From Swiss-Prot:
One of its GO terms (cellular component) is cytoplasm. Part of the 50S ribosomal subunit. Contacts protein L20. It comes from the Bacteria. GO terms for molecular function: rRNA binding; structural constituent of ribosome. Pfam families: Ribosomal_L21p. Keywords: Ribonucleoprotein, Ribosomal protein, RNA-binding, rRNA-binding. PANTHER family: 50S RIBOSOMAL PROTEIN L21 (PTHR21349), LARGE RIBOSOMAL SUBUNIT PROTEIN BL21M (PTHR21349:SF0). This protein binds to 23S rRNA in the presence of protein L20. This is Large ribosomal subunit protein bL21.
Length: 100
């Protein structure tokens, strides 16, 4: 069984036992979170399923890879180099439920 969930403005295809990296969630490591925005469950449709939930365990709160931002204006000796690291949460999917 698989599900498509939405969190942090992005959609993820998940199965039981899969590990995903999502935008930062307010949860401590080792705690369980419940995601109720299931877009699709085993191909049942493309609308939000109000009775479907996905339970996941928070494995880690960390930061992603660094993204380099480089701005330049030619012939003007203008160069700016900055970087950014986004906070992410690593989840392990434990359970996919569909209450009927």
């Amino acid at each position: 069984m698989f599900a498509v969930i939405e969190t942090g403005g992005k959609q993820y295809l998940v199965k039981k036992g899969s590990v995903i990296k999502v935008e930062k969630l307010e949860a401590e490591e080792g705690k369980e979170v419940e995601i109720d925005k299931a877009v699709c469950l085993s191909g049942n449709g493309l609308s939000y399923l109000t009775d479907a939930t996905v339970k996941a365990e928070v494995l880690e709160q960390c930061r992603g890879e660094k993204i380099i931002i480089f701005k330049k204006k030619r012939r003007k000796n203008y160069r700016r180099k900055t970087g950014h690291r986004q906070y992410i949460t690593v989840l392990r999917i434990n359970e996919i439920n569909l209450q009927k």
